[in-house]
Amino acid sequence: MSSVMIKLALPCLFLLALSSALAEPAQVRLWPQGAPGARGDSDKDQPFLLVWPAPKDKANGAAFVVCPGGGYGGLAADHEGTQVARWLNGRGVSAFVLHYRLGTSGYHFPIQLLDVQRAIRHVRAGAKQYDIDPGRIGIMGFSAGGHLTSMAATMFDEKPEGMTHDEVDQVSARPDVAAPTYPVISMTEGFGHKGSRKNLLGPADTDELARHVSTELRVTEKTPPVFIFHTDEDTVVPAENPVAFYLACRRHGVPAEMHIYRPGPHGVGLFLGDPVLGSWSRHLDDWLRNQGFYKPVKRAALSGRLSVNGTPVSWGSVIFTPEDPAAPLACARVMHGNFKLDEKSGPVQGRVRLTVSYSAADVPGLETVDGTVTTQEQKPGAGAWSLEIKGGDKLNLEISR
């Protein structure tokens, strides 16, 4: 990522939004002097961001560009834009809802790639003004916006026709994480979405161009970590789309997590009213936390042993919970009393609380409903169990019952 930081000429309205956290977002055009290839000066011709700064009492420095769906023919800007921005704000994340140009307005590929790259570059270049970390900028999109998200995650090095090559365009367009949500992925397979292909490619549509924008074919080892949500009952954009993208990530060693729920039609958004389907956003929340997206931290490698009454446990787990709720958790699997975590998956350095689980069979005469014992105390009445993690620790965890 480029270290270039650029002082942007931001509209007064946006500056006011930053200082007073207005309820309504500021609208910021991606090219204040006019977008390349634009046919007019209206909002449908000039792509823009709706800026939702995180509340100052919650802001953690992370940001997301949000791409509503609509088959590249419209924008579901409320439930796949505004509602998502508010959800992100609730987690301390600044949100930038992208209104990109559409095929129904006469704009076809590579215009949409140009717009999403510029959006990421704009946010990164203005990190100081937006009070965000240029190394924690994610992208999330829904349906066709999910396809645009996947293009941003796989084609960030591509230089589409129309780049202005100004200072903003010198900044990296690579997102740090990507969350394509019930996404269109393939433009060539039978499970692709024909309407999105028609609107995206327009009269220049060829099989070669369709393969070029089929993002399951564009994944490389440089693709950022990916979180995917979809439903099995989606008949508009079948689940084969995200599965193809997930498998491509696996082949290239890209960290990826996918959740496919059985019930649910296409286009559900956050769907927080459904206690089951709406839980997908909680998984995203956990994933972002454990990616270190909410708070960059130094993690530590460690190893150790876990015993109960002097006897190594047969199996179990140790969860390390940091004091900062935005910092990632760590969980070590215990087998035959031993556990080990490398620096990539270990706990954050500093004070952590321990939650230990083990087999009830390891304590003679002890029975529980599920055969498992979970405790946050080293011994009865001792209070919460905590310790200081420095790195390279060799822990000897002894539980007394």
What are these regions (language model features)?
Residues 76-78, 82-83, 97-134, 272-278:
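Catalytic nucleophile-loop/oxyanion-hole region of alpha/beta-hydrolase
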Residues 295-401:
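Glycine/proline-rich low-complexity segments that form flexible loops, beta-turns, and polyproline
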Residues 52, 229, 239, 243-297:
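C-terminal catalytic histidine-bearing segment of alpha/beta-hydrolase fold enzymes
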Residues 118-196, 210-211, 215:
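Primarily recognizes the serine-hydrolase "nucleophile elbow" in alpha/beta-hydrolase
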Residues 60-69:
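Short beta-strand element of the alpha/beta-hydrolase
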Residues 24-58, 192, 296:
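N-terminal cap/lid segment of alpha/beta-hydrolase-fold proteins
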Residues 68-73, 232:
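Active-site glycine-rich loops that stabilize anionic/oxyanionic intermediates
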Residues 228-230, 234:
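Short beta-strand/loop motif that positions the catalytic acidic residue
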